[in-house]
Structure formats: structure tokens, C-alpha cells
Design a protein with these regions (language model features):
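DPxDG-like acidic metal-binding loop motif
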Residues: 26-54, 68
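N-terminal lobe of the biotin/lipoate ligase/transferase fold
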Residues: 1-9, 18-23
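Short pre-catalytic strand/loop immediately N-terminal to key active-site residues, enriched for Gly-Thr
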Residues: 14-27, 169-171
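Glycine-rich beta-strand-to-loop/alpha-helix junction loops that act as flexible
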Residues: 30-31, 173-178
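Phosphate-handling active-site elements
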Residues: 6-15, 41-62, 186-196
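Conserved, helical-rich catalytic subdomain that frames metal- and/or nucleotide-binding sites
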Residues: 71-170, 185-196, 201-205
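Short beta-strand->loop micro-motif that forms the acidic, two-metal-ion catalytic signature
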Residues: 179-184
């Protein structure tokens, strides 16, 4: 990210220390987020005044989903993940809901996941689905990676099913895995006890 920006702007050499707060190989876009935030940091620290659109242009050169993390907003992505548009829920956003992340000690190879996936033609555009009440998403909003990944790692499917048993309004695998997320209307209890020996995270959106 630094080298890319330095091609067009005069930047001094910098020393950065990255402290990762999320697990790696989790399907959470951690590496892409790191790249995007480096662009944001350089823009802010050195007053480059690039603006979001310009930063997204640079970010898209670094990776398919890097541009998504420039604004950190709920977005609908097309192209290779670099063409973004607002994608709100029926209430305008997901504010007030609770998000749960469960990441077991399983590392899913992104290359392997892409090699085995068979993308399905959606019956309805996901941009329209997310405008519906969240309790309708379960039967209409899918992650095509789940079929091959769950086949190889049935533990992940079990986690998703358990989240629904805990009254998640919606649950899905994140990206190519191996994190499973759940969205709840109320703060769930005993998450760490329910999913022992896993990385767990609960927050309010």
C-alpha cells in the first residue's frame, strides 16, 4: 500500500507496527482491511486529501475487496468487489443488532475454496434481499462457498446450525471461511460456553 501511494505522492519513509485483533485465514478480510487502512492512514497523516473515491481506486489495485474497507459502510459490491453502492437493510441499517463471530481452529485455503466452488445464478438480487426484513434472509441470501467448504469441514455447518438454535436471525459463513457469523436481535448469552475452544466475538452494531 505504501509503495503504491508513494508512486504518485512524495512520502517520507515510515515505520509501522501492525497489531492484528482478528484471526488470520478467517474469511474476514483482515489483510484487505490492513491495506485499506494503510492508505487511509497515509492520506490522513500526510494530508494528501485524496478523498474516498481516489483511495478506493488505489485500494482496488491491491486486492479484490480492499476498496470495501475504505469507507467501512454496508455496501453492495459488483465487479471484482471494487464497484460499491449502498446496501441497507429494511430499517436503513443494522444498528442495534448484535453480531457474533465464531472462528474454530480451522484454516480454509482461499485458493482451494475458489477451485471447488460452483457459483449459482441467484433467483433474486442480494441487493433486493437485504432491503427485506432480516428474518427473510435465511431462505434467500446464500454464500455459495458454504456447499464445498461445509462438505469438507462439517464442523462449520454445525456452528451455523447452533447459531440458529441460539435464536440468530441470520447466520452465514464469512467469505470463504472459516468464520461463521450470526446476527441477533438481542444480545446472546453463553456464547463462549456454547462454542468452546474457538475464537468468539460479540458486539452491538
Amino acid at each position: 500500500a505504501y509503495n503504491l501511494i508513494a508512486e504518485d505522492y512524495q512520502l517520507p519513509r515510515v515505520h509501522t507496527h501492525l497489531y492484528k485483533r482478528i484471526p488470520t485465514q478467517a474469511g474476514l478480510g483482515g489483510g484487505s482491511a490492513d491495506a485499506a487502512y494503510m492508505i487511509r492512514l497515509l492520506d490522513e497523516r500526510f494530508r494528501l486529501n485524496m478523498g474516498n473515491a481516489e483511495m478506493e481506486r488505489y485500494a482496488s489495485k491491491l486486492g479484490a475487496d480492499c476498496a470495501f474497507f475504505i469507507r467501512s459502510e454496508i455496501s453492495y459490491a459488483t465487479g471484482i468487489g471494487d464497484i460499491l453502492a449502498p446496501a441497507d437493510s429494511e430499517s436503513g441499517n443494522l444498528n442495534g443488532y448484535y453480531l457474533v463471530l465464531i472462528k474454530p481452529d480451522i484454516a480454509v485455503s482461499t485458493a482451494e475454496a475458489y477451485a471447488t466452488i460452483e457459483p449459482q445464478q441467484p433467483i433474486k438480487c442480494c441487493r433486493d434481499i437485504v432491503k427485506q426484513p432480516i428474518d427473510t434472509w435465511r431462505t434467500e441470501l446464500f454464500n455459495d462457498f458454504e456447499v464445498p467448504v461445509f462438505k469438507r469441514y462439517p464442523e462449520l455447518k454445525a456452528i451455523k446450525e447452533k447459531l440458529y438454535e441460539k435464536n440468530a436471525l441470520y447466520a452465514q459463513m464469512s467469505g470463504s471461511g472459516s468464520t461463521i457469523f450470526g446476527i441477533f436481535g438481542r444480545k446472546p448469552v453463553d456464547i463462549e460456553k456454547t462454542f468452546p475452544n474457538t475464537f468468539t466475538y460479540v458486539c452491538r452494531l
